[in-house]
């Protein structure tokens, strides 16, 4: 029973890290990256549809994303969805494809994006701490219900803390790497 609590905590902390990793992938670092468009939803025949399911996305140049819709009639819908997103990019629609030119980042904008990375990291660490808190409560309940001894509870709490520290360290490392990528451009 007690190992289930630890295993569940590890799984949930890893999920928090995965969510953070996917959020980091959508942060613009001044270079074209197809994952920038992962969260863009297009209103397609009245149904919100992920852009990546509606179009091929290629990178013909280091700072250009080219979006080729599978259905040419959705070109304007895709353009509107990109404009409505929080990407801060202006699409160029030539009637067949949409080009997104990723502008060079100014020093000020780099700092803003680095702060955003920090904010995302803090949200991920809060999620990890919430998982830790749930695991600790579960261990206390197990001890109270007589499922585990007090010594076992302390040992397992230390293990939960160790997993929490490892997860937090991993998040910090990912944030530092992304900040370096952004600052160096």
Curated annotation (Swiss-Prot):
Any GO BP: translational termination
Keyword Magnesium: no
Keyword list, A-Z: Cytoplasm, Protein biosynthesis
UniProt GO molecular function: ribosomal large subunit binding
Signal sequence interval, chain numbering: none
Regions that span the bilayer: none
Subcellular location: Cytoplasm
Major place of residence: cytoplasm
One cellular component (GO) term of this entry: cytoplasm
Family, as annotated: Belongs to the RRF family.
Annotated function: Responsible for the release of ribosomes from messenger RNA at the termination of protein biosynthesis. May increase the efficiency of translation by recycling ribosomes from one round of translation to another.
Xref: HAMAP family: RRF
Protein name listed in UniProt: Ribosome-recycling factor
Organism whose genome encodes this protein: Lactobacillus delbrueckii subsp. bulgaricus (strain ATCC 11842 / DSM 20081 / BCRC 10696 / JCM 1002 / NBRC 13953 / NCIMB 11778 / NCTC 12712 / WDCM 00102 / Lb 14)
Top-level taxonomy: Bacteria, Bacillati, Bacillota, Bacilli, Lactobacillales
Primary gene name: frr
